[in-house]
């Protein structure tokens, strides 16, 4: 089936220009308490009206009065208003509240705006709108958006968050239609200087260290004997480069982890350009005879005193130079930008060579990848015809062949949530543009069994039915999650025996219920970042999870899944450590069927991503990007980020699928990551996504040659061919699978 790529999704429900006068739309009644506390109630607490509090120190920011939610006994207690019947489904609303806290010696706390939604089937839902850090000193503004996809029976908006016995003060709360702002134009880069290092004296060739300076009381000097070639990832981006001089910066007398060399680069940074960072680093034993255990080295930026990660690597003290790589992008004009190197423990000498920071020409990288894609994702196809007329009419009326690919079989999927599928516009875009799906939370253990013994798979069942009904394959995410903060409280409280029994029951319930329905499972999510089950049940429990899952349902591929594997940002999840994890699991008998790279990435650089893919390829397992999302305030830059990742994955022979972690505004975990606005308009990033998908469809046009053949090279997938003959038009379809040899398709025209 051909995937429709329409970029407008509107209906009578969201065509407000014809149906609603926005000035008459009142979602919140009595928003400024001019009518006392009418329409407002306490959520399991008392609410009172004040002109002032604390001996006149607290007065309204606007108006004459404010409300206080008091005598709160739990964090979810607060002030609320029911808005049932006053909002419109599929319409994006903006909430603006002026809040403050008071009492119980709490000087600062999070205040959160939440929607409680009761659906027609009695299913409860909590939607976090926004939160803000409130204080007892000043009023602050809480601002956020929400959209309701379905037609619930009740909806209540309330404030919550601070510790018990601390009052929530509310001066005003307004809800209005959130109009979409016109997107910013694509950035214009005048003389971007692609590939030009903005770090001064990075090779310290003259033996001096200016303009470098130290953070702290450490000392800088110059050493000799560093590698004379650029690190591999920089070399991959920059191409041929003159040999380096071999000098390097030596940092000694370090008494704190943050001590190291620094340099100001404020005036050299251009907004919205993506910069690659690269260097050689090495550690030496300092005067204190420091620890020989692995140490973290971090190249960082201080952007107006805010830390920005520029890459991290784990290094052992010794004679070996290690590559460190990363990337960054700034989208707001800073006052000061400083690059610095930090990380190893006190007393350890730090050595840095050939630090490079340069803007990357990502479009040129994509052009190169397209040539690589032709080798990896396409196949030669020969349409061999029989039954052609042998008379002279063939020369007078050649047979014209039109080939159109209707479907690319490469998996491109997305995350969906249960509430999303109540919106028919969401479902329309989803089913037309994706061939795989994964559930955001609905299959996770904390969702299916929040309370011990109360198992509910209804949401997952609803979503699975939608996918199966539209021939969309589904990944199972996830059976377990190894990070302790994601484990529901009742599981955390179990003793060792009960926990093992609960683990085995979870496996049996899930894998038996859905046997044969999920194509993949993420067995134990994020094992490089957590160890809840391993710490309590022993190292062998991880392999046991894989083994039991495989026995219960042998059909799905069983995946490991983790984040920051592909970007150089986190030494805990480097490709080398991921490889070791997989090999350890397999040594214990686990059947690891696939490697999941989540792909929550900032300012992606192709050479860094490709390096990780190359390393992981040695495992010989299919690699999937399982949770890909990118973020930029500029929709064009966001689209470029996504394009970089799509082509990088598509061009690598070991990558067998890409899953986006959502696409619809307010249904994603990251801000400025959506491809479709909350009311259905495809934004510039979404348009770029659809354009790339169109590029992944092959078309051919020509005539049958003297050998009764028509040849072309095309992507794997489904095709329709139209043959125009003197006797009429013939229509055929065929499928191109992966293969190293030309695919011959025989077509008989003798019946004409």
From Swiss-Prot:
Residues 1-22 are annotated as: Disordered. Gene3D superfamilies: Galactose-binding domain-like (2.60.120.260), Glycosidases (3.20.20.80). Its EC number is 3.2.1.8. GO terms for molecular function: endo-1,4-beta-xylanase activity. The keyword Hydrolase applies. Residues 26-163, 197-344 form the CBM-cenC domain. Keywords: Carbohydrate metabolism, Glycosidase, Hydrolase, Polysaccharide degradation, Repeat, Xylan degradation. The keyword Cytoplasm does not apply. The active site is at 526 (proton donor), 627 (nucleophile). The GH10 domain binds to xylan. Belongs to the glycosyl hydrolase 10 (cellulase F) family. This is Endo-1,4-beta-xylanase 3. It comes from Arabidopsis thaliana.
